[in-house]
UniProtKB/Swiss-Prot annotation:
Catalyzes the exchange of L-arginine for agmatine. The arginine uptake by the bacterium in the macrophage may be a virulence factor against the host innate immune response. It is found in: Cell inner membrane. The gene is aaxC. The keyword Transferase does not apply. Its main location: membrane. The chain crosses the membrane at residues 9-31, 46-64, 85-107, 127-149, 156-178, 209-228, 241-263, 293-315, 335-357, 367-389, 415-435, 458-477. GO terms for molecular function: antiporter activity. This is Arginine/agmatine antiporter. NCBIfam families: 2A0302. Keywords: Amino-acid transport, Antiport, Cell inner membrane, Cell membrane, Membrane, Transmembrane, Transmembrane helix, Transport, Virulence.
Length: 483
């Protein structure tokens, strides 16, 4: 029997789940926010961008919270919501795409970690793709593999410590920039329209800034993905909202406070990680060292979180036959051992791509970043569908009308995110998703679920994805679209 009874060691509380959400969202990119946000935008545009993004992501976060309350039977969130709402193939596709996204994302963390180490040990890890960097990055892959194999609860405890250590330098940055904040500097050219430093229209500034905020909340689904290991399913919704609110507040303060101590054109010239550059100007070398240390801790912590999430989705999909049954194997610590080894093994292989072709790797990262977005859309659409059905519980704390409005707005924002990701990337996503079709068909046959997995509706869905992939191959080969 592959599926074992749950052990208390697998149970996670609100604090552990919130730690997963925060560390999943806060990666190394947050330490570059000041420069990234102001490169072509004023303080006013940055403020508007965070407000709009915050509202949009709130609807997605609230969708996850609502679903965890009204459908507590659906574990592993984004996968089971998609399967329940739109059939086994859509569920498989979401799981497959999310899994690939996590694998490539974790290898990116390896690259960023090595590049961050280069600040302390130049030039051995420059660019994150030298031989020493590949060797140490590979070692870290298997160290994280070992930590998660020791049990999800133990790994989440390590993750909480890492999240706290990540937040400390960020909070110090906020306190220091608040100390040096001058409103007279902050309000100078608030909308970026001064002739000597014109940044274009508010619309163009907003567009460039929104593309940065677009990726800041990837990982908000963390608690939902591992909801099957939650001590109380109400903790899943609480952790999602707490993580979202905390990260949004940090993002806003981190982006806006530097406008009160340095002018926009000064901030735009600071090299990444720009938090280090800002503190170097304000307080000296120790501030730069602090931020680079924080960057290193943040990336390692986020890497651990994504390792947990990457192994959990195939495990959950295997439990009901969508992925091969071997992915459901657990070890004595109730960790998804086979899924974890397979994930780490693919990450190890992918590390070679980083060494041999950094350009190809950067392109792949842009593509896989888009692959997580359909999961937000299908989850939101599932709540729309369920809130309009007679199955919606009448005594639910969240009324059906509120759930429908929230999920509809979440769906619209998810569509915007997918559109903003770029058409060329969507076509490449279609190719990667089509690669999973043989595995889906094989799972259906092995589990003797042909009537469910391979009926006309599911075959039609597979055909649409396959045709989209063929169209993408044609357009790329004919140079009609480019990455």
């Amino acid at each position: 029997m592959l599926l074992k009874k749950r052990s208390p060691t697998s149970i996670l509380g609100t604090l552990a789940l919130t730690g997963i959400v925060i560390s999943s969202m806060i990666g190394g990119g947050i330490f570059s926010l000041p420069q990234n946000m102001v490169a072509s935008a004023s303080a006013g545009a940055v403020m508007l961008a965070w407000m709009l993004s915050g509202i949009g992501i709130f609807f997605i976060a609230n969708t996850f919270k609502t679903l965890s309350i009204i459908r507590p039977d659906l574990k592993a969130g984004i996968y089971t919501y998609s399967r329940e709402g739109f059939g086994p193939y859509v569920g498989f596709t979401i799981a497959w795409g999310y899994w690939l996204c996590q694998i490539f994302g974790n290898v990116d963390y390896a690259v960023i970690t090595m590049d961050a180490l280069n600040y302390f040990f130049p030039p051995y890890f420059a660019g994150g793709n030298t031989i020493p960097a590949i060797l140490l990055g590979s070692l870290l892959i298997w160290i994280f593999n070992y930590i998660v194999l020791r049990g999800i609860r133990q790994a989440s405890f390590v993750n909480i410590i890492g999240a706290v250590c990540t937040l400390i330098p960020l909070l110090l940055f906020i306190l220091i920039t608040a100390r040096f904040f001058k409103f007279s500097i902050f309000k100078t050219d608030f909308w970026g329209t001064a002739p000597q430093h014109t940044l274009g229209s508010i619309g163009s500034q907003l567009k460039s800034t929104m593309l940065v905020t677009l990726w800041a909340f990837i990982g908000i689904e963390g608690a939902v993905v591992i909801s099957g290991r939650a001590a109380n399913l109400s903790s899943v919704g609480k952790a999602t909202i707490l993580g979202f609110s905390g990260c949004l507040l940090i993002y806003v303060l981190l982006s806006l406070l530097p406008f009160g101590s340095l002018f926009q054109y000064q901030l735009a010239k600071i090299a990444d990680p720009s938090t280090a550059g800002v503190l170097n100007i304000l307080v000296g070398k120790w501030g730069e060292v602090l931020m680079n240390t924080g960057l290193l801790i943040a990336v390692l912590t986020s890497w651990l979180s994504w390792t947990i999430l990457a192994s959990e989705i195939p495990y959950a999909a295997a439990k009901n036959g969508t992925f091969p049954e071997c992915f459901a194997i657990e070890n004595s610590k109730h960790a998804p051992s086979f899924s974890l080894f397979m994930t780490s093994g693919l990450m190890q292989i992918t590390m070679l791509l980083v060494y041999f072709s950094s350009n190809a790797w950067n392109t792949m990262l842009e593509i896989t970043g888009v692959m997580v977005l359909p999961a937000y859309l299908t989850s939101s659409l599932f709540l729309v569908k369920f809130s309009l059905s007679k199955k919606y519980p009448k005594q639910a704390a969240i009324k059906a009308r509120i759930a429908m409005i929230t999920s509809l707005l979440g769906s619209l924002y998810s569509l915007w995110l997918i559109y903003a990701g770029g058409l060329q990337h969507l076509f490449m996503v279609a190719i990667l998703l089509a690669l999973g079709i043989p595995f889906y068909v094989d799972s259906g046959i092995r589990h003797k679920q042909e009537k469910t997995f391979l009926n006309r509706k599911e075959i039609l869905k597979m055909t649409i994805v396959a045709l989209a992939a063929l169209l993408a191959i044609f357009l790329f080969s004919a140079n009609k679209i480019h990455l």
